[in-house]
Amino acid sequence: MIILPAIDLKEGKCVRLYQGDFKASKVVAEDPIEVALKFKENGAEYIHIVDLDGALTGQIKNLSIISSIIKTINIPVELGGGIRNLNTIDMLIDAGIERVILGTAALNNRGLVEKAVKKYDKKIAIGIDAKNEKVAINGWLNISSTNYIDFAKEMEKIGIRNIIFTDISKDGTLKGPNLNQLKKLNESVSCNIIASGGIKDIEDLKVIKEMDIYGAIVGKAIYSGNIDLNEAIKIINKESSR
C-alpha cells in the first residue's frame, strides 16, 4: 500500500479543513515547497495536492506553487481541485502532474471523463467525496442525489483505474476513516482505491492495508504529529514484504 502525504493549498499556504468546511481552515505551514521537500526526505513516493481555491472557483489558482513543488521534489504528484475542462487537464499534464483528479467535473460532465481517459489513460483519476453515501460537488458545498457506489461503477465502465474516496464527515477529524464505506467501495469495483479522510494513526493505516486498499492519503495526522511519515512508510512497507 502506498501512503500519500497531503498538501491542501489555500491562498498559497498549506491548510487543513475540518469536515470540508472552508470557514474552518487552519494554516499548518506557510511554505508548501518546504513541506513537500520534507515529505520526500521522509520517504514519500507520491504526494497528493488539492487546490482548495480552485475547488471553490472552478479554476486552478495555485499553479505557480504547484509547478515549483513538482520541479523541486521530482517525485509524482496527483492534483485535484478546480479541474473542469480538457484544456486545464492538458496544461497540468504539461506542467508535470502525474495524475489529475476529477471530481465535480466528472459528475457533471461524463463526456469530459471519456475524452480525458482516452487521451491520458491512467493519468486521470476520480475523486469521490461523499456525505451520507451521496457524492458532494463544488468544493463540497453541494450534495448530489448520486450514490457513491453507483458513481464509482459508472466511472469504472468509462475506464477509470484510480478512485480517491473521502467521507467528508471524517475529513480532518482524526477520528478514523469510514471503513464500512471503504470496504463496500473496494468490493464493488476493481479500480485502485485510495482512502482519504480521518486517518489518525498507524493502526488505521494497518487496517486499511489489511483491507487490500491500494493507497491512503494522510494529512492532519502528519501535521499534528500523530503519524511519523517516515516510520509509517517503513512499517507499511515491512508488512507488505512479509
From Swiss-Prot:
GO CC annotations on file: cytoplasm
Protein name: 1-(5-phosphoribosyl)-5-[(5-phosphoribosylamino)methylideneamino] imidazole-4-carboxamide isomerase
Pathway assigned to this chain's UniProt record: Amino-acid biosynthesis; L-histidine biosynthesis; L-histidine from 5-phospho-alpha-D-ribose 1-diphosphate: step 4/9
Active site: D8, D129
Gene name of the record: hisA
Catalytic activity: 1-(5-phospho-beta-D-ribosyl)-5-[(5-phospho-beta-D-ribosylamino)methylideneamino]imidazole-4-carboxamide = 5-[(5-phospho-1-deoxy-D-ribulos-1-ylimino)methylamino]-1-(5-phospho-beta-D-ribosyl)imidazole-4-carboxamide
Cross-referenced Gene3D superfamilies: Aldolase class I
Enzyme Commission code(s) on record: 5.3.1.16
Top EC group: isomerase
Protein family per UniProt: Belongs to the HisA/HisF family.
Keywords of this entry: Amino-acid biosynthesis, Cytoplasm, Histidine biosynthesis, Isomerase
InterPro entries in the cross-refs: Aldolase_TIM (IPR013785), His_biosynth (IPR006062), HisA_bact_arch (IPR006063), Isoase_HisA-like (IPR044524), Isoase_HisA-like_bact (IPR023016), RibuloseP-bd_barrel (IPR011060)
One function term, GO molecular function aspect: 1-(5-phosphoribosyl)-5-[(5-phosphoribosylamino)methylideneamino]imidazole-4-carboxamide isomerase activity
Protein location: Cytoplasm
Pfam families: His_biosynth (PF00977)
GO process annotations (BP): L-histidine biosynthetic process; L-tryptophan biosynthetic process
